[in-house]
């Protein structure tokens, strides 16, 4: 009894699987996705049968009539070719993976603007006398007044242009960077220079080359203002950094406007703080760092304003704290550190001829100190101590 029942169940299972295999159509058209949809006539509608809608069949038939997304084709292959034409050329194509779309960007043709100069201006620039190569804003940007809506002179005035007969001129053309000769022509003030910046009236610019009868290279403002200049000045050969040499702070390399050769850093040599290398405005050769050598704190290398050769660090020698290397003001060679009363001195003593090196104070009476050096006898040594 069990064996015939099993055979009957297997036969039912086989019939069920074969019925699922022939749902989409016959075996001849099973590989064509479009064939299953082309079998229906044009007027028919894909509706569920009435018996399936009323639920009269069994459960197996109802499962067959339910819509199944797995059985629907994902891509429908259509034999017809589609051709699209666009009025503008495509600039680039991109794919949006989030939206599953293709993005096309078209080119916007820009209107052609007539930005040519006047024929007379072009003829003048092409001449041999006007050998100029310029970068930046041009002195003349000429456009016809009857093109691109620029015929209205009031609208042109609001744009910042100046109307002149048939063309408009850009008043902002003075700010440019120019290489070569000036635009003035071969006569007059024609100079051979290379200029960066604004016009040469009184504005801020940086210029390389010759100026009015001078051979120099200048960076900065006009001649009466703060600038940095390389080369010859008005009759002098120097290189100067900073303001004018009247009474202001500057740094100058080269010859003095007088007749001396020096290199100076700082303010003017009247009574201010400066650092100077070279000859003294008097007649001496020295190198000085600091303030005026009258009674202020400075550091000087070279000869003394008197007639002695020394190198001094600190304040003046009138009783203040300083450190001096070189000869003493009385004509002797020593090296002293500290104040005149409490100091450390290396060298010869001013009163004696003995050679020693002494550490300590020098009061009118004997004190505790440590002295290194030779002496002729003890009496001279004691008198020297009392004198100091």
UniProtKB/Swiss-Prot annotation:
Highest taxon of source: Eukaryota
Modified residues (Phenylalanine amide): 179, 196, 208, 219, 230, 241, 253, 265, 277, 289, 301, 313, 325, 337, 346, 359, 372
Region annotation Disordered: where it falls in the sequence: 40-74, 360-388
Prodomain positions: 22-172, 375-388
Polar residues compositional bias, start-end: 64-74
Biased composition (Basic and acidic residues): 374-388
Localisation: Secreted
Alphabetical keyword list: Amidation, Cleavage on pair of basic residues, Neuropeptide, Repeat, Secreted, Signal
Signal peptide: 1-21
GO biological process: neuropeptide signaling pathway
Cellular-component GO terms for this entry: extracellular region
Entries under InterPro entries matching the protein: FMRFamid-related_peptide-like (IPR002544), FMRFamide-related_np (IPR051041)
UniProt tissue specificity: In the brain, expressed in 2 large cells in the lateral neurons in each optic lobe, 2 slightly bigger cells on both sides of the tritocerebrum, around 14 small cells in the dorsal area, around 13 cells in the subesophageal ganglion, and in the central brain.
Family: Belongs to the FARP (FMRFamide related peptide) family.
Protein's name according to its UniProt entry: FMRFamide neuropeptides
Primary gene name: fmrf
């Amino acid at each position: 009894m069990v064996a015939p029942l099993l055979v009957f169940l297997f036969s039912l299972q086989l019939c069920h699987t074969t019925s699922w295999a022939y749902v989409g159509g016959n075996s001849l058209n099973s590989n064509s996705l479009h064939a299953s949809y082309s079998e229906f006539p044009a007027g028919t509608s894909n509706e569920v049968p009435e018996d399936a809608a009323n639920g009269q069949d069994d459960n197996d038939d109802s499962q067959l009539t339910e819509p199944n997304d797995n059985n629907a084709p994902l891509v429908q292959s259509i034999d017809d070719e589609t051709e699209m034409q666009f009025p503008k050329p495509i600039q680039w194509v991109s794919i949006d993976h989030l939206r599953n779309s293709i993005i096309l960007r078209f080119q916007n043709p820009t209107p052609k603007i007539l930005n040519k100069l006047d024929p007379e201006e072009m003829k003048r620039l092409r001449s041999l006398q006007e050998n100029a190569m310029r970068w930046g804003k041009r002195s003349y940007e000429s456009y016809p007044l009857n093109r691109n809506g620029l015929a209205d002179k009031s609208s042109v005035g609001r744009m910042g242009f100046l109307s002149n007969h048939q063309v408009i001129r850009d008043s902002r053309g003075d700010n440019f960077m120019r290489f070569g000769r000036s635009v003035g022509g071969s006569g007059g003030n024609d100079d051979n220079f290379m200029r960066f910046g604004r016009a040469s009236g009184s504005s801020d610019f940086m210029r390389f080359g010759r100026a009015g009868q001078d051979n120099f290279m200048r960076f900065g403002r006009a001649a009466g203002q703060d600038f940095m200049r390389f080369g010859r000045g008005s009759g002098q050969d120097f290189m100067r950094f900073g303001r004018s040499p009247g009474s202001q702070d500057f740094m100058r390399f080269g010859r003095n406007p007088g007749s001396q050769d020096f290199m100076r850093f700082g303010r003017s040599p009247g009574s201010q703080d400066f650092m100077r290398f070279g000859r003294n405005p008097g007649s001496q050769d020295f190198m000085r760092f600091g303030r005026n050598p009258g009674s202020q704190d400075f550091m000087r290398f070279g000869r003394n304003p008197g007639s002695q050769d020394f190198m001094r660090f600190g304040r003046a020698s009138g009783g203040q704290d300083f450190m001096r290397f070189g000869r003493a003001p009385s004509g002797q060679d020593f090296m002293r550190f500290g104040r005149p009363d409490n100091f450390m001195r290396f060298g010869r003593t001013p009163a004696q001829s003995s050679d020693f090196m002494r550490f300590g104070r020098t009061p009118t009476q004997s004190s505790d100190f440590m002295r290194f050096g030779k002496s002729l006898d003890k009496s001279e040594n004691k008198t020297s101590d009392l004198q100091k």
